[in-house]
Amino acid sequence: MSKHKNQRTARTLEKTWDTLNHLIVISSCLYRLNLKSIAQIALSVLAMIISTSLIIAAIIFIISANHKVTLTTVTVQTIKNHTEKNITTYLTQVPPERVSSSKQPTTTSPIHTNSATTSPNTKSETHHTTAQTKGRTTTSTQTNKPSTKPRLKNPPKKPKDDYHFEVFNFVPCSICGNNQLCKSICKTIPSNKPKKKPTIKPTNKPTTKTTNKRDPKTPAKTTKKETTTNPTKKPTLTTTERDTSTSQSTVLDTTTLEHTIQQQSLHSTTPENTPNSTQTPTASEPSTSNSTQNTQSHA
């Protein structure tokens, strides 16, 4: 049936193309004869035919595709039915003893049913089978225990991400261009490297600073010594004043006279009986006589 439909569709498409070719030839002839109105009508009809033919062809292809899909689903269902029928026929033909023997290694329930009817030899076999099953279960539990160990190894996989991040840090700034993110990454690399160098530099810097501080201190000490020596020079002025004019010497004599007068007044107030009082005027009298002689010489 599908072959006949495909042949029909092919024939209809051929007929439509033939009619389209004839209409194109007719429209060209009408243009040559200057019958534009008739040519326009023919072209409109041609467009309608083309659109209808395309729609018909699309519908036909869709139907054929759906028919193919239904055929595939039918074939799959038929295959399943055949397999199920074959299995059922095989089970009906095979005796139940073979079926039970085939099921014994998988399940333990048929073992107990047979143990009631069989001899003690068969019971021992059943014990062996149960022991084997128990051994399998124990081995399975033992195999499950080491499975927990690799789980502990999974967490150390995190540093791999850090390693990739470190590799990403080594980005040359020449590649960045105008990308601000790339520039920010490039700035972090040099900022981290020089941090290690200043740890060595501060050890050398203090040595230079101490030498610079000691140099300016030495002239300061010399200046202090000079200030101490200045007061010693002041008494020299007194020596120079003695060699000056006579007017200055008279002033000094008057000062000495005043001192002597004060001493005499003090001696006059002291009692005469004390031995100290008798001795003091003897010491003071020559001083007064000397002072008077000096005044006369100057006069």
From Swiss-Prot:
It comes from the Viruses. Glycans are attached at residues 70, 72, 81, 86, 92, 100, 113, 137-139, 141, 199, 203, 232, 236, 254, 276, 284, 290-291. Disulfide bonds join 173-186, 176-182. GO terms for biological process: symbiont entry into host cell; virion attachment to host cell. Residues 67-299 are extracellular. One of its GO terms (cellular component) is virion membrane. Pfam families: Glycoprotein_G. Residues 212-227 have a biased composition (Basic and acidic residues). Residues 89-160, 189-299 are annotated as: Disordered. Residues 129-147, 200-210, 228-250, 287-299 have a biased composition (Low complexity). Residues 148-157 have a biased composition (Basic residues). Residues 187-198 are annotated as: Binding to host heparan sulfate. Residues 99-123, 251-286 have a biased composition (Polar residues). The record marks 65-66 as: Cleavage. InterPro entries: G_prot (IPR000925). The chain crosses the membrane at residues 38-66. Keywords: Disulfide bond, Glycoprotein, Host cell membrane, Host membrane, Host-virus interaction, Membrane, Secreted, Transmembrane, Transmembrane helix, Viral attachment to host cell, Viral immunoevasion, Virion, Virus entry into host cell. Residues 1-37 are cytoplasmic. A motif (Microbody targeting signal) lies at residues 297-299. Belongs to the pneumoviruses glycoprotein G family. This is Major surface glycoprotein G. It comes from Human respiratory syncytial virus B (strain B1). The lineage of its organism: Viruses, Riboviria, Orthornavirae, Negarnaviricota, Haploviricotina.
